[in-house]
Amino acid sequence: MLAVLSPAKSLDYESPLTTSRFSEPALMHESALLIEQLRQFAPADIASLMHLSDKLAGLNVARYAQWEPVATPQNARPAVLAFNGDVYSGLAAQDFDDADLDVAQQHIRILSGLYGLLRPLDLLQPYRLEMGTKLGNPRGKDLYAFWGDIITGHLNQALTEQGDNVLLNLASDEYFKSVNVKRLAGRVITPVFQDEKNGKYKIISFYAKKARGLMARYLVKERISKPEQLLDFTVAGYGYCPELSTENKLVFRRPEDLSQ
């Protein structure tokens, strides 16, 4: 089973690293093309393009200027320890041991607007470039056009290498749109996490993001290899709802009293 995650906007380059291991991103040449284009923008242009404050736009212009075509432990850190949002709070990779990291490296991929597709230990330099950014480029009007079938091709390769054809979609719609499902050599299973609020169940973004990370952690820690094993996921109070689920859409619900 191969799981895909979204990246996070917030980054952590301050906390102590919990591993000295790292790997090199496979698509750095493509990333360098995007950086070259982003370096042409003034801070005001970045603010407009990405809907950022002037302060954040200035920070990211500086990041693009400092980005290097060769990542090293001196200018980057493993992606799974650099991303710092709700998904990664649930994943909590800081306590992974070497065996866990081996499993994660083989069975988890992170979609990225700048890097295309990352393994957990791939070195990540600070950046901001969401997949939905309407960045016109020589390949088309946006990043979906830029990446085309490149991401899908690398996912197919990863599916082959890890031994089956099941892709666990733990990414947001914005990021999973970068995958050409028609050309994907695998079955896509998408978990849906709903929380109860005022007596009604719905997807609450903060909780759903963290739950995706929790399921990725479950995959790693429990060495999950078969889709039916996912049905036993009961972490943080969630439970599988067979009456709402289909073969490829797995619905998990959590009562309000268990979300506190």
From Swiss-Prot:
GO biological process: response to hydroperoxide
Entry-linked Pfam families: H2O2_YaaD
Disulphide connectivity of cysteines: none
Top-level taxon of origin: Bacteria
Signal peptide: none
Entry's Gene Ontology cellular component terms: cytosol
PANTHER family reported in the protein's UniProt record: PEROXIDE STRESS RESISTANCE PROTEIN YAAA (PTHR30283:SF4), PEROXIDE STRESS RESPONSE PROTEIN YAAA (PTHR30283)
Database matches in NCBIfam families: PRK02101.1-1, PRK02101.1-3
Family: Belongs to the UPF0246 family.
HAMAP family: UPF0246
Protein name, UniProt field: UPF0246 protein Tola_0968
Taxonomic source organism: Tolumonas auensis (strain DSM 9187 / NBRC 110442 / TA 4)
Taxonomy of the source species: Bacteria, Pseudomonadati, Pseudomonadota, Gammaproteobacteria, Aeromonadales
